[in-house]
Amino acid sequence: MAGGTALTPTSVGSKSVPMRNHEATERGNTNNNLRALPKAVQPVSSIEGEMAKRPRGRPAGSKNKPKPPIIVTHDSPNSLRANAVEISSGCDICETLSDFARRKQRGLCILSANGCVTNVTLRQPASSGAIVTLHGRYEILSLLGSILPPPAPLGITGLTIYLAGPQGQVVGGGVVGGLIASGPVVLMAASFMNAVFDRLPMDDDEAASMQNQQYYQNGRSRPLDDIHGLPQNLLTNGNSASDIYSWGPAQRVMSKP
């Protein structure tokens, strides 16, 4: 119809129904908007289910990066080593330990011993200090002491032993002579490379400190190895030998602060 609104026929069933152009345009826009809507968000419960199904840990076959090996080429000078020493029958225990300390250049601290000895020469701990020689076979109850490689100050090394006799008597004292093993003797000892010699007691009052400081300023301190002739490896204790001094006419040995 001229001058009227254009109509577009549509089919409803078997009949054609005219539809206006603007109505068709609006319906087309509506369909486009529906297609542009985002998809429905997945429920949180389903997401948690998927996360729970994921395997934990590293993927199969994954490994750490290899670390470079740590190689210790020598012992620390201040290390303390445990030694189990077996001494054969017929050997002098004191001479064997002294030879071991000299060859290894390590000091020994004897902690315990098991076995039997014979022909023991002891200095009794009584005030008389009598020296006795025990003949026969005695079982070791206790063996304590220290052995240092030469040169070492007199009186700083030695062994003290307590023995059980065949009749059950107990004797003991400082070993001053032979100590012959009667069968295998096993000792537990701690060995060390460094030792520091100190003379005690040290004066801590203010007057002694001022006096020591005065001697230090006057350059009258002397290294310990010049006084006692100790080997260098038994003096350092990780520091230089100059860190150890003797102070004053009383020959006190103190460490530099």
From Swiss-Prot:
Residues 77-214 form the PPC domain. InterPro entries: AHL15-29, PPC_dom. Disruption phenotype: Abnormal pollen wall with the absence of the nexine and intine layers causing microspore abortion and male sterility. GO terms for cellular component: nucleus. Keywords: Activator, DNA-binding, Nucleus, Transcription, Transcription regulation. Signal peptide: none annotated. It is found in: Nucleus. Residues 53-65 bind DNA. GO terms for molecular function: chromatin DNA binding; minor groove of adenine-thymine-rich DNA binding. Residues 1-71 are annotated as: Disordered. GO terms for biological process: pollen wall assembly; vegetative to reproductive phase transition of meristem. Its main location: nucleus. Preferentially expressed in the inflorescence meristem and young floral buds, as well as in seedling-stage vegetative meristems. Widely expressed in flowers, roots and stems, with relatively low expression in leaves. The PPC domain mediates interactions between AHL proteins. PANTHER family: AT-HOOK MOTIF NUCLEAR-LOCALIZED PROTEIN 15 (PTHR31100), AT-HOOK MOTIF NUCLEAR-LOCALIZED PROTEIN 16 (PTHR31100:SF48). Transcription factor that specifically binds AT-rich DNA sequences related to the nuclear matrix attachment regions (MARs). Encodes a nuclear matrix protein that acts in the maintenance of genomic integrity by silencing TEs and repeat-containing genes through epigenetic machinery. Acts as a chromatin remodeling factor that modifies the architecture of FLC and FWA chromatin by modulating both H3 acetylation and methylation leading to the regulation of FLC and FWA expression. Negatively regulates floral repressors including MAF4 and MAF5. AHL16/TEK knockdown results in late flowering phenotype. Interacts with FVE/MSI4 and MSI5 which are components of HDAC corepressor complexes. This is AT-hook motif nuclear-localized protein 16. It comes from Arabidopsis thaliana (Mouse-ear cress).
